[in-house]
Amino acid sequence: MNNKLTERQILILKAIINEYISTATAVGSKIILEKYFNNEVSSATIRNEMSVLEKEKYIEKPHTSAGRIPTIKGYQYYEANLAETKISERLKQKLMAILNKRYHSIDEVIEQSVEFINNVTNLPSVITKFKSYDLLKRMDLIKINNNTAIILIVSSSGEVIKKTIKYQNSIQYNDVSTCVQIFNDRLVDTPFIELKEKLTAIKEIVRTKVHEYEFVMQRIVNYIFDINEKSTINIKGTKKLVIHPEFHDHNKLSEILNLLENTSIWEQISFMQQKTGKSVITFGQDIGIEGISVASTLIETEQNKHQIAIVGPNRMEYGKIKGLLNILKEQVEKIDHLNLPLEEINKES
């Protein structure tokens, strides 16, 4: 902890931030004295300690109130030293009940769980999926008519990518069918990020098996595997932003909405987060937008990486949100590792 702060100053700082998180109203010495010190010290003592905290830039006085609010330095100290990473047993059981349900994919588990976290925090979220970690699981060819077919590319996360192929005759259709068979034989379980390299290695095999090699290369190989390897983002709960007074200003609201859609920001946070492996708090000033905080975790399964970020004002419940994200990360990675529904995992523990 910071040696400059006494135990009493730390208690007062914690009280101010807890009150401000709950009420969004500047905090005066009277509420601190009555609620946190049970009138056991004088009001002058509380005011003096608050003056020290203000001088050290942990709190500040807003223009419209006689009370005090936390500064970014105060929030950073609170998050690092005072916010308890825990949630109530009732909240934990509700999240576990969602995780216990049977889903078709890890993506679905994450989406349903994050929607629950949105609702209990009244904050929006960003789910970033790093696509390059997906594996090719299967390719299917569906003939639509005499000159059109659809190729379905199924990924390890359950995503189905559809590609329409135009051809002129049965020879070209047969070439397409041959290619799909070769790809299923030789490319299944290849990460999408490695497909181009693997395709280079099997080009000569394709050349010996098809009649119109140039058609195959232009219309199938280059077209089908022109799959976006960049991360994709899924934003949930943006309407919840207007609940918070910090975002009543239209310019500030527009700024944070632009942030939510900025893929590079989430990649930047993910890069910083990989050093810790835990749920972390990133303050807005570190990513170029003041007045917000981002609580995030990185879920690493065998085949994919998902970053879950909860976005809100600095006045967010850090411990509660980190507690929820920690449970989500731990349980999803356990489900993936054991390849079992959570209810069966819990029977073994």
Swiss-Prot record:
UniProt xrefs under SUPFAM superfamilies: GAF domain-like, Winged helix' DNA-binding domain
Domain of life of the native organism: Bacteria
Keyword Ligase: no
Keyword set includes Transcription: yes
Keyword terms of this UniProt record: Repressor, Stress response, Transcription, Transcription regulation
MF annotations from Gene Ontology: DNA binding
Transmembrane segments: none
Family annotation (InterPro entries): GAF-like_dom_sf (IPR029016), HrcA (IPR002571), HrcA_C (IPR021153), WH-like_DNA-bd_sf (IPR036388), WH_DNA-bd_sf (IPR036390), WHTH_transcript_rep_HrcA_IDD (IPR023120)
Family: Belongs to the HrcA family.
Alphabetical list of PANTHER family matching this protein: HEAT-INDUCIBLE TRANSCRIPTION REPRESSOR HRCA
Name recorded for this polypeptide: Heat-inducible transcription repressor HrcA
Organism listed in the record: Mycoplasmoides gallisepticum (strain R(low / passage 15 / clone 2)) (Mycoplasma gallisepticum)
Upper taxonomic lineage: Bacteria, Bacillati, Mycoplasmatota, Mycoplasmoidales, Mycoplasmoidaceae
